[in-house]
């Protein structure tokens, strides 16, 4: 058993141990919860609180400025896409048409009055009443026409095929054998077919075009430009 002196000496040692523990505890508290720590914590809390209003302000600006422009930008993008799509389609169609050209045949039909026959851009009327050249021209004028004129071989062949009688007055005439042949509107004859004879008025015969004196009575052919042309493809 320990002696009484040893027991009496123990309290001072225990007292020193407790004192050291309290000092260490106090030191830890001062290092963790001292004024500097408290100040740092308060600074961090203030920084966080000061940042919150700034972020809220950015959110308000985002919702107030950017979002209202978004539908307009979306519509603009859609419009651009539509325009580009239409342009691409139009270009494709144009290229396809260019690659495969269409060949169309246009037939022209003269629109002529009743009992008139259309050839090219003219209408012809075959008058079976025999008259001299001057009176035959008068009959044609009454129908807003002239004694027949032809400018192409097609028209000439048509007249020769359908003239009927041995000879029909046409619109060729001249002042004398020394002058050139002209039509009733005084335009020059293109000499599509030679004219036989030395007289001053022309008529269409089985052999072509011949000249005769104007007082001879013959059938006649009138011609005029068609009023309009209808086209069929």
Curated annotation (Swiss-Prot):
SMART domains noted in UniProt: CLECT (SM00034)
Keyword terms of this UniProt record: Cell membrane, Glycoprotein, Lectin, Membrane, Receptor, Signal-anchor, Transmembrane, Transmembrane helix
Coiled coil: none
Membrane-related topology note: Single-pass type II membrane protein
Record InterPro entries: C-type_lectin-like, C-type_lectin-like/link_sf, C-type_lectin/matrix_domain, CTDL_fold, NKR-like_CTLD
Biased amino acid composition, Low complexity: 30-43
Pfam families, per database record: Lectin_C (PF00059)
Region (Disordered): 1-45
PROSITE patterns reported in the protein's UniProt record: C_TYPE_LECTIN_2
Compartments where located: Cell membrane
Entry superkingdom: Eukaryota
GO molecular function: carbohydrate binding; natural killer cell lectin-like receptor binding
Entry annotated with the keyword Transmembrane helix: yes
Positions in the Cytoplasmic compartment: 1-73
Official protein name in the record: C-type lectin domain family 2 member D6
Organism: Rattus norvegicus
Lineage: Eukaryota, Metazoa, Chordata, Craniata, Vertebrata
């Amino acid at each position: 058993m320990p002696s009484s002196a040893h027991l009496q000496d123990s309290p001072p040692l225990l007292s020193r141990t407790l004192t050291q523990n309290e000092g260490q505890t106090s030191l830890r508290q001062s290092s963790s919860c001292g004024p500097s720590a408290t100040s740092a914590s308060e600074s961090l809390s203030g920084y966080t609180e000061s940042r919150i209003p700034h972020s809220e302000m950015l959110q308000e600006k985002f919702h107030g400025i950017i979002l209202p422009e978004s539908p307009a930008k979306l519509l603009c993008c859609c419009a651009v896409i539509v325009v580009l799509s239409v342009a691409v389609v139009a270009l494709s169609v144009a290229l396809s048409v260019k690659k495969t050209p269409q060949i169309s045949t246009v037939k022209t039909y003269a629109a002529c009055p009743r009992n008139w026959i259309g050839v090219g851009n003219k209408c012809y009327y075959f008058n079976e009443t025999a008259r001299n050249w001057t009176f035959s021209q008068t009959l044609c004028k009454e129908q807003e026409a002239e004694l027949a004129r032809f400018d192409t071989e097609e028209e000439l062949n048509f007249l020769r095929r359908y003239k009927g009688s041995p000879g029909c007055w046409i619109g060729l005439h001249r002042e004398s054998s020394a002058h050139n042949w002209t039509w009733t509107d005084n335009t020059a004859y293109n000499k599509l077919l030679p004219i036989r004879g030395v007289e001053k008025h022309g008529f269409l015969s089985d052999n072509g075009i011949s000249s005769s004196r104007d007082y001879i009575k013959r059938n006649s052919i009138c011609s005029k430009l068609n009023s309009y042309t209808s086209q069929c493809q």
